[in-house]
Amino acid sequence: MSKLDNQNLIWIDLEMTGLDPEKERIIEVATIVTDKDLNILAEGPVLTVHQSNDLLNKMSDWCIKTHTENGLIERVKQSKLTERAVELQTIDFLKQWVPKGASPICGNSVAQDKRFLYKYMPDLADYFHYRHLDVSTLKELARRWKPDMLNAFNKKNTHLALDDIRESIEELKFYRTHFINLEK
């Protein structure tokens, strides 16, 4: 049972064929909704976008290796979903939990994801509040102010969108307790 709430947070992660939205495309989108205290309320659909073999063959060696090992390239080839279909399915899920414009975009390095959303999924980009809740900001502050903390939180780095979101939420919980020193 969904619960529409202005305080709920939308976590998103994209996997792309590269880092340049002028040349690269989105290949996977996942979302999770948490309450304000970072408790997971719902996991959205993990959606794979079909892209051409030509585009996939132009990916960097790192992308080809990573997305072959995690199975994403094969799922992209098998998918029948367009970027627009993925965008609409994601928005339909989010509407159950968070009103449009209420939640900042949450995750790690979300400015990069937002660049791709503006280019290829503008309605989804517009669903978010203009603010960002970027876990990588705390990571950068910890790197400068408390570097010994960085090795205390280990990520698996599967480069699968849903796994990455779960890790981002856990990472923010870690920083909340050990860096910001707020107990929940």
From Swiss-Prot:
<keyword id="KW-0378">Hydrolase</keyword>
<dbReference type="GO" id="GO:0005737">
    <property type="term" value="C:cytoplasm"/>
</dbReference>
<keyword id="KW-0269">Exonuclease</keyword>
<comment type="function">
    <text>3'-to-5' exoribonuclease specific for small oligoribonucleotides.</text>
</comment>
<feature type="domain" description="Exonuclease">
    <location>
        <begin position="9"/>
        <end position="172"/>
    </location>
</feature>
<dbReference type="GO" id="GO:0003676">
    <property type="term" value="F:nucleic acid binding"/>
</dbReference>
<dbReference type="GO" id="GO:0000175">
    <property type="term" value="F:3'-5'-RNA exonuclease activity"/>
</dbReference>
<feature type="active site">
    <location>
        <position position="130"/>
    </location>
</feature>
<comment type="similarity">
    <text>Belongs to the oligoribonuclease family.</text>
</comment>
<dbReference type="GO" id="GO:0006259">
    <property type="term" value="P:DNA metabolic process"/>
</dbReference>
<protein>
    <recommendedName>
        <fullName>Oligoribonuclease</fullName>
        <ecNumber>3.1.15.-</ecNumber>
    </recommendedName>
</protein>
<dbReference type="InterPro" id="IPR013520">
    <property type="entry name" value="Exonuclease_RNaseT/DNA_pol3"/>
</dbReference>
<dbReference type="Pfam" id="PF00929">
    <property type="entry name" value="RNase_T"/>
</dbReference>
<dbReference type="InterPro" id="IPR022894">
    <property type="entry name" value="Oligoribonuclease"/>
</dbReference>
<keyword id="KW-0540">Nuclease</keyword>
<dbReference type="InterPro" id="IPR036397">
    <property type="entry name" value="RNaseH_sf"/>
</dbReference>
<keyword id="KW-0963">Cytoplasm</keyword>
<dbReference type="InterPro" id="IPR012337">
    <property type="entry name" value="RNaseH-like_sf"/>
</dbReference>
